[in-house]
């Protein structure tokens, strides 16, 4: 924790240092993607980009992006296999595009002949809209990953199916993105039938043994968390604060401090990270979520059970679930062919937690643990294209 406070304090002082004498050369060191959204990153790298809004059954308006084909495939005809990708907590869909094109899963899949779609979870920067509710209202933020699974994912998949004419697609999730998939596919068999294969990277199902400093937050009572963070959104985008962090971390002498901060959060291996892209990673997170989502994750913390959100009273639970206690998610009910990857140094999804869920996946077709990987390596690791992405494509060709 002292390292985190030092990071935050120093980062806040950096803008004054810059304005005082231009001691640090900020502008010349920033990657252009820092200022771009997902669509702009796609086009900047020479790929075709499409952007759509999807309205869920409960009224949330979600922004999704599409890369219909790779850079060198404009002459190819016929439908391409569809892939949908779901990001982690506090991220957005630029998450899949933040390394160079030859190291980003979104671009690699497009170049491999796939029709790539990437969603944004409700409440993040790009999906903070609703047909009737304002983001200033507490009711807008009354959701967790339960609603993302119940409404967001079915709505997006229906949209993709209607747009492409293809009835089935591949699903790739990382971290909380896997949670959304597991909940949806285990509770909605009709949706599960549309999934050719479920690729789960660093799956968050069991959350009993995390060692990240970040998870100490979940030791606090729910009332204290609400007192500190409020009852609406949490870690919403703050461009000024984010630029302070980016300025700080762009300095070569100070990058080790940023590495330490990220290591405390979710593990970090700078030898497997392109440190010149650190500003791009930080520019697109955090993007925000609901405090209710955080409380649902807290509910999993050090628990033996994987349940729907507890609304806090028998009456409220009865109103939402028609029973006095939130229902268990039954992973054994999920019949989708599934592949899982885990990291041996992952401090959020530890090997012990992964071991607890594997017996519950009744159609597990592939499992691999990389002993040296942490939670970020799945999306940012320099060796991810060779060790992970190539295997994903191989399995897609097998389960077509």
From Swiss-Prot:
User: Its catalytic activity?
Assistant: a sterol ester + H2O = a sterol + a fatty acid + H(+); a triacylglycerol + H2O = a 1,2-diacylglycerol + a fatty acid + H(+); a triacylglycerol + H2O = a diacylglycerol + a fatty acid + H(+); a cholesterol ester + H2O = cholesterol + a fatty acid + H(+)
Query: Which of UniProt's keywords are assigned here?
Result: Disulfide bond, Glycoprotein, Hydrolase, Lipid degradation, Lipid metabolism, Secreted, Signal
Q: Which cysteines are joined by disulfide bonds?
A: 249-258
- Catalytic residues as annotated in Swiss-Prot or TrEMBL: 175 (nucleophile), 346 (charge relay system), 375 (charge relay system)
Pfam family, any one? Abhydrolase_1
Gene3D superfamilies, from UniProt?
alpha/beta hydrolase
Give every AB hydrolase-1 domain span: 81-381
Name of protein? Lipase member N
Q: Which organism is it from?
A: Mus musculus
Q: Which gene encodes it?
A: Lipn
């Amino acid at each position: 924790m002292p390292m985190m406070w030092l990071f935050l304090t120093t980062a806040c002082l950096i803008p004054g240092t810059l304005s005082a004498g231009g001691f640090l050369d900020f502008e010349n060191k920033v990657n252009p993607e820092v200022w771009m959204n997902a669509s702009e990153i796609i086009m900047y790298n020479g790929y075709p980009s499409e952007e759509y809004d999807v309205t869920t059954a409960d009224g949330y308006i979600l922004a999704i992006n599409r890369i219909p084909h790779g850079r060198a495939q404009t002459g190819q005809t016929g439908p391409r296999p569809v892939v949908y990708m779901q990001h982690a907590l506090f991220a957005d869909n630029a998450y899949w595009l933040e390394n160079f094109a030859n190291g980003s899963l979104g671009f690699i899949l497009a170049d491999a002949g796939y029709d790539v779609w990437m969603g944004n979870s409700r409440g993040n920067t790009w999906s903070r809209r609703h047909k009737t509710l304002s983001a200033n209202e507490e009711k807008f933020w009354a959701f967790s990953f339960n609603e993302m699974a119940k409404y967001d994912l079915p709505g997006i998949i229906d949209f993709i199916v209607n747009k492409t004419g293809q009835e089935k697609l591949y699903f790739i999730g990382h971290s909380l993105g896997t949670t959304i998939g597991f909940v949806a596919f285990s509770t909605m068999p009709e949706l599960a039938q549309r999934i050719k294969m479920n690729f789960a990277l660093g799956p968050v199902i069991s959350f009993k043994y995390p060692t990240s400093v970040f998870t100490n937050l979940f030791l606090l009572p729910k009332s204290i968390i609400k007192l500190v963070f409020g009852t609406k959104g949490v870690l919403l985008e703050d461009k000024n604060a984010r630029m302070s962090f980016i300025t700080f971390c762009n300095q070569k002498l100070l990058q080790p401090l940023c590495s330490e901060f990220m290591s405390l959060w979710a593990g970090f291996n700078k030898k497997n990270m392109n440190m010149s892209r650190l500003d791009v990673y930080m520019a697109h997170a955090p993007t925000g979520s609901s405090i209710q989502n955080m409380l649902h994750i807290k509910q999993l913390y050090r628990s033996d059970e994987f349940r729907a959100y507890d609304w806090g009273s028998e009456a409220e639970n009865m109103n939402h679930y028609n029973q006095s206690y939130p229902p268990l998610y039954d992973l054994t009910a999920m019949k989708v062919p599934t592949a899982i990857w885990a990291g041996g140094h992952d401090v959020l999804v530890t090997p012990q937690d992964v071991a607890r869920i594997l017996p519950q996946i009744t159609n597990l077709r592939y499992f691999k643990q990389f002993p040296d990987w942490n939670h970020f390596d799945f999306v940012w690791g320099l060796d991810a294209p060779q060790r992970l992405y190539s295997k994903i494509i191989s399995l897609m060709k097998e389960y077509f």
